[in-house]
């Protein structure tokens, strides 16, 4: 953590992944954010990293953070949710409402804004999906996602080919 968020070098790296928001390369991969700080900013940085990997199609887990005064090593119980997720079949994964909503927003943008994204999403079959892959999505999340998609799809005008 640097000045309450990610360091400049990490921010620069994350900025270079901007196209991944449109053509996510890490779909279905679990990510364990790790944060260290001298004092404050751990929670905000963890949230920032979790949001960034959500853009990539990954699913962030509860991260592990340490401050300078907390030098205890990472314990197995802290890693267990991540280890379980590594072995979880995709069909049993349950995305959050945020992930379902973000997927639908990405889908509308892919289908309406840029030809390169439209082709990518259609090749993956995501243009007809409720989420990147078949998984456990509650009825409420599924309906909210479909409603959001329908509203945005009607409102966003196609912007040509680029």
Stretch-by-stretch model annotation:
Residues 1-59, 130, 135, 139:
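Helix-loop-strand module that forms the ligand-binding subsite of alpha/beta enzymes
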Residues 59-162:
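Glycine-rich phosphate/pyrophosphate-binding loop and the adjoining helix
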């Amino acid at each position: 953590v640097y000045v309450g968020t990610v360091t400049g070098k990490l921010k620069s790296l994350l900025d270079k992944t901007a196209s991944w928001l449109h053509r996510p390369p890490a779909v279905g991969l679990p990510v364990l954010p790790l944060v260290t700080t001298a004092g404050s900013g751990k929670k905000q940085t963890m949230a920032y990293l979790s949001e960034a990997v959500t853009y990539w199609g990954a699913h962030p887990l509860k991260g592990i953070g340490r401050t300078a005064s907390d030098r205890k090593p990472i314990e197995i119980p802290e890693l267990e949710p991540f280890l379980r997720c590594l072995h979880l079949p995709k069909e049993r994964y349950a995305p959050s409402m945020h992930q379902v909503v973000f997927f639908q927003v990405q889908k509308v943008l892919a289908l309406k804004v840029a030809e390169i994204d439209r082709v990518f999403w259609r090749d993956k079959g995501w243009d007809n999906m409720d989420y990147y892959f078949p998984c456990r999505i509650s009825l409420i999340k599924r309906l909210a996602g479909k409603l959001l998609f329908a509203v945005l799809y009607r409102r966003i005008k196609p912007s040509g080919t680029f």
